[in-house]
């Protein structure tokens, strides 16, 4: 991977960077049979009310159907292409299986066109192969990790992320993992995961350069509450630049914004977390 820098021909181009896609991607034409329509909701629900702020606009996109379950077992596949996916910051690979089926999977660091991969109970510990956590050695970096067997990968799917296997329980029921965030948690040993780290690891180094590039991505401006009217935000109103008039900042709906823990401690998975991501080391 490489970061592409631009000459400061305009103010928007100054300090702008982007991913050098030509260095990794092999085609710009997606597989038609694995495309689906994607309608932009602009952050609205079925009643037209904003449920997620700062969303709307952006370039028209088609959804790529990704195989997160890796449930095509014991059938060898060949990586045909490495492609761009507008719906995620990771790249994707088109896999041609021996029985003729085609599927998209996440691109892992080290994958190349022509590489053979397989999802199997006792697959080799090789980048791109998928296997149950109980059969993957300790210390291995993995991605696309399931939380429930058969549900499909839910953890470590973003560009540059990975999960490390720290250990296994004596009874063989759970495997202990360390996530990118620093959290240490247990996952059922029968859950599948894919070997390797997700590619496009330099994505977080991209400098978008100008507001327009974020608008192309469907991200709208974030406006401070203190410059709104009082009917739009609790911080709004007043003549000129005035304090918020409260002991502590609040959300647009009046709830405290700082120092409040947002995780529900009554979730059943709470007992599986060995160490919190924000625990003092």
Curated annotation (Swiss-Prot):
CC terms in the record's Gene Ontology section: large ribosomal subunit
Keyword Chaperone: no
The entry's keywords: Ribonucleoprotein, Ribosomal protein, RNA-binding, rRNA-binding
SMART domains, per database record: Ribosomal_L2 (SM01383), Ribosomal_L2_C (SM01382)
Region annotation Disordered: where it falls in the sequence: 222-281
GO molecular function per UniProt: rRNA binding; structural constituent of ribosome; transferase activity
Domain of life (superkingdom): Bacteria
Protein's UniProt keywords contain Nuclease: no
BP GO terms, sorted: cytoplasmic translation
Entry similarity comment: Belongs to the universal ribosomal protein uL2 family.
Role according to the record: One of the primary rRNA binding proteins. Required for association of the 30S and 50S subunits to form the 70S ribosome, for tRNA binding and peptide bond formation. It has been suggested to have peptidyltransferase activity; this is somewhat controversial. Makes several contacts with the 16S rRNA in the 70S ribosome.
Self-association and partners: Part of the 50S ribosomal subunit. Forms a bridge to the 30S subunit in the 70S ribosome.
Protein name as catalogued: Large ribosomal subunit protein uL2
Species classification: Bacteria, Bacillati, Mycoplasmatota, Mollicutes, Entomoplasmatales
